Amino acid sequence: MATFYLPDAGETPGCHPLTLTRSLGDFPLANVTLRRHQQATLLAAGLTEASGPDADLTVHPAAWFAPAELATFVADASYGTMSIADGAVLLTRKGGQRDLRATQSFAIAYAWDLLRANVEAMTARKHYVQESGAHASVYVDGRLQVGKGTKILPGVVIEGDVIIGDHCKVGPNCYIRGSTAIGDKCHVGQAVEIKNSILLPGTNVGHLSYLGDSILGEKVNFGAGTITSNLRHDGGMHRSPVAGNMVDTGRRKLGAIIGDGVHTGIHTSIYPGRKLWPETSTLPGAIVDKDILS
């Protein structure tokens, strides 16, 4: 049986501020770390994990594989590399000569790529388990997973694939839709709408907020009325600054990327694609039109 080696990601500036406080492999998608997703996909393809670079196959640490493309590569020993359109090589095999050009697999090069991977992880998930109850008035149109000790209060509406971790409080009267993953010990409160987003553990979005196509790190607190914008007036693709350069995200909808421990003042408005570095904050009524680094 062929073996694979999955190295650590190392420095990943494209995913800052999220990877300033954790490795990329430790970032949760559908409340499971990227590394665990990668390992599960590779093992399901019939490979065995090795502890060092002498393995038959070496995996790009930011690779996200489409299972069908991975199966094609594994089955044909003549393939020596799996690459994608930007030239990144997701997988190499000793002794192989040919290149398999993948169209569905990708590398998580930027923070917004985590949103894409989260959608795919949640769509592929077969079992959604409810380990805690919800109020009888809760409306679910989709698949909902609820962790232990979590309370879902009256008036909550769920649409799409939603995962809520352990010991959370959700509601009353909030709307969660799309592919949204909420980590352990989070609070999503009165009149909050969340769409296609990721909340890491210990985060609070308590009152009158909109969070769309966004990622919030651990122990973030959104002051009442904090709003993320996710759509340009002209409907064009969002661009976001990375290491001093403006990068086309390829996304028509993109909200905010928020690092660990950020606090926003009440009525903060955040432009699309803006990023707030860990432990930064905003004043009440702030308009965030550029990244906040300190």
Question: Which residues does each predicted region cover?
Answer:
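Surface-exposed extracellular loop regions of Gram-negative outer-membrane beta-barrel proteins
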Residues: 183-189
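Conserved short-loop catalytic and cofactor-binding motifs
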Residues: 23-26, 102, 138, 156, ...
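Extended, small-residue-rich solenoid/repeat segments and analogous flexible loops
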Residues: 94-175, 179
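Terminal amphipathic alpha-helical/low-complexity segments used for targeting or macromolecular assembly
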Residues: 1-132, 279, 285
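Residue-level recognition of short loop/turn positions
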Residues: 10-11, 149, 167, 185, ...
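Glycine-rich hexapeptide-repeat left-handed beta-helix
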Residues: 190-191, 196-294
